Amino acid sequence: FCYCRSLSGFCGKIIEYSENGEQGGQAPLQKRLRKERYTMAESMQGLKRTHRCGELSAANVGETVTIMGWVQKNRNKGGLVFVDVRDRSGIVQVVCEEGKTDAPLLEKAASLRSEYVVAFVGTVAKRSGAVNDKITTGEIEIIPSELRILSSALTPPFQVEENSKTKEEVRLKYRYLDLRRPDLQRNLMMKSQVMTLTRQFFAEEGFIEIETPMLGKTTPEGARDYLVPSRVHPGSFYGLPQSPQLYKQLLMCSGFDRYIQIARCFRDEDLRADRQPEFTQIDMELSFVDVDDVIDVNERYLAKLFKEVLDVDVQLPIQRMTWQEAMDRFGSDKPDLRFGMELTDVTDVVRGCGFGVFTGAIENGGSVRGINAKGQGGMPRKKIDKLTAFVKDYGAKGLAYIAIQEDGTVKSSFAKFMGEEEMADLVSAMKGEPGDLLLFAADQNKVVWDSLGALRVELAKQLELLDKNEYRFVWITEFPQFEWSEEQGRYLAMHHPFTMPMEEDLPLLEKGELGKVRAKAYDIVLNGNEIGGGSVRIHMDDIQEKMFEALGFTKEQARSQFGFLLEAFKYGVPPHAGLAYGLDRLVMLMAKQDSIRDVIAFPKIKDASCLMTEAPTPADEKQLEELGLEVKAQPEKAE
């Protein structure tokens, strides 16, 4: 049979062969097909896909169907060819058998290789062999009557399969292949479902979806903006939005009452495991509301979202916890509540003891706190030393410990500095029992919180205490209004300059006691991850002026950066509040992934570059000239 190409496919013309299978000096057909691998593409003219691969079931037995997709696997058993065809819905098996399948089709099917794009027309039949319970189409197979190779493929640099062990750098370079993997496709389809449900829910709640500008005014406060040079205004730049914050507040001034947007945002900052230079927010703002109103609508949203997407019931109301309580109990403002191991403040217990590390920290205004790792009293010293090195990354000078043996005796790094009664009181305060390991940090509160909070999570990972099938939400409220910057030597806004202080703390703002002022701010935390945050906004001129003054803004500076917003506030501004979710992080947790890169189609790596497109790249000289820009050579970084 001849396989020369035409618009309708291979012509199938019969060619005479000699006994040894050769014709015109050519190798036998089977050998030529194996060598050429059908690199010619055929048209799909006249064909229409009737079903996706994973949609077929026993209910379709006897039907003639047309499927299209990628070859996942081809198994040639010599006269019996099994082809697994894959699309985003799943996999279905096509069976070609000598004597039952036309010889040209059998030969053609035998030549297929992984990732060829194919179209099969055939009849759905019950499987002649064992049922495959691993796939949804495991009861059936397709007996083909027609095959077209729509596109051939080179051998891919890695196998397209679930939970690939290929290095991430390779997968990101060939992201278009990586995205064919079923697990990544499920992630992105879940993300699409989340966005659809989000729009539906908030539309039913009376929210209006409004787009805000991508090209806005750059502001020097906070994270660095991505700058976009203006060709028509030489020397001037737009800033890509870090959030739609100012615009959504203006929309409240405009009377839109309830705003929602799935917004693209940009931040030019050093990347961490849960950060990307461009990301997506579910952004909202509401007028004539307070904290409870924002929390109420968002609890109902989360309950609906998790029920619809994951069939998980979210218990309402969601637990609330003040920032101070979260820090004292968990050493973190985004606590993971799936396990215990809470911090215990033993400052008063060890005050005046003989251990200088403890008493020195207390005398310097710090605290002593500990965690009880239940059942870990037998942990080897080398492992404890590794934990000590771990907390040093968070500013701690060391880690003191008490290992309670099964017989009740203790091994401790500081027992010789304390009396028996002091040690017994400390163990009692920590609720220590035989077999427990007690770990302590002594320093300024922030260092103790940060180090023990991180240690708590690290131990939970090592001890496998984290259940990915459990979803524990908590609202964190009453954040500090300001945080001290050692680098800048001044107070900065913990959230942004437009966050409303707690009414009862306004006198503290007046007196300049900024470290004591609490904000009407709130975060929603899931399994130790902040998935959203927001606040009630300032809508009163006098309080806004005091905020700017506290942050070190002159009136001229405030007007230069935020003049358009302040001007709008002069024409009547309603009390308003809002919240924004990090969509990527939310979906990451729902999909039980470890990185937001696995829920973003084309993510960047840690240096904010794209391995696939090689962005960013130098601009063309002509482009720079049009923009009135000149690039200065940067000094090479030291090795």
Predicted stretch roles:
Residues 13-39:
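Short, Lys/Arg-enriched N-terminal segments with co-localized hydrophobic residues
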Residues 6-8, 18:
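Serine residues within intrinsically disordered or low-complexity segments
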